[in-house]
């Protein structure tokens, strides 16, 4: 049978989700835990591949296994006891045999957190930026993103990508006492896309670029035309949605 694992992780201590030959990844740690508990190799296929230092409040991965009578009900508890403190399992859901954690996802939502003050407790969970930002201009620019579908200008260079088309359905900045949060939802994202978008919008907020410039940047399809890529530690994958009919 096929199952979806729902889980969270702090990405600080990991070189991203995907297994790496000479570095520790979230996938490696979770697969090792599953193999130890279930006494057989359990390959995981996740909804996406977060980069080094990126966090996930909600992530899904699918796997196949024929559970014994009492194994399934205990697995979430056992995994949480076995895994390190920075990975937490939330649920185990039975899905249809063809359900795919990556390809069946309808949407993904990311948040990027910027702090306007120094904090010794949260420096691995946000990007520190003390300059004042023009949020009104940044939100005008965020709306521009939803007018386009080709985001090659925000894609990491020299990556094997079949299509640069993404449908962004929400993009907005909010302000709090602690700083700024950017929330963006799309059906899919390119590698490094959110961090490049945030860096570009920050440059607009600092008046280094204009909202009108953003149209030209997107139309150029040139990564060097866009802004800088902000650091990974402020980025969180926060929500993934699936068709209800996948779940049994």
Residue spans of the language-model regions?
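Structured-RNA-binding interfaces characteristic of tRNA pseudouridine synthases
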Residues: 1-248
């Amino acid at each position: 049978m096929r199952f979806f694992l729902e889980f969270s992780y702090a990405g600080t201590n990991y070189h991203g989700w995907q297994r790496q030959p000479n570095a520790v990844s979230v996938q490696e740690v979770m697969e090792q835990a599953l193999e130890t508990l279930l006494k057989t190799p359990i390959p995981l296929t996740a909804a996406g591949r977060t980069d080094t230092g990126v966090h996930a409040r909600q992530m899904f991965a699918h796997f196949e296994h024929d559970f014994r009578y009492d194994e399934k009900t205990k697995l979430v508890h056992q995994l949480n006891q076995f895994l390190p403190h920075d990975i937490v399992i939330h649920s185990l859901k039975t899905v249809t045999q063809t359900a795919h954690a990556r390809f069946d996802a309808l949407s993904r939502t990311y948040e990027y957190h910027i702090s306007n003050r120094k904090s010794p407790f949260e420096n691995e969970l946000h990007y520190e930026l003390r300059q004042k930002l023009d949020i009104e201009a940044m939100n005008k620019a965020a709306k521009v993103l939803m007018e386009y579908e080709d985001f090659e200008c925000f894609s990491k260079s020299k990556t094997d990508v079949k299509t640069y088309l993404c449908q962004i359905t929400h993009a907005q900045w909010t302000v709090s006492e602690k700083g700024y949060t950017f929330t963006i939802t799309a059906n899919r994202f390119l590698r490094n896309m959110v961090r490049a978008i945030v860096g570009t919008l920050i440059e607009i907020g600092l008046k280094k670029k204009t909202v009108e410039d953003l149209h030209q940047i997107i139309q150029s399809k040139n990564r060097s035309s866009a802004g800088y890529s902000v650091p990974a530690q402020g980025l969180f994958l926060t929500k993934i949605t699936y068709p209800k009919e996948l779940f049994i």
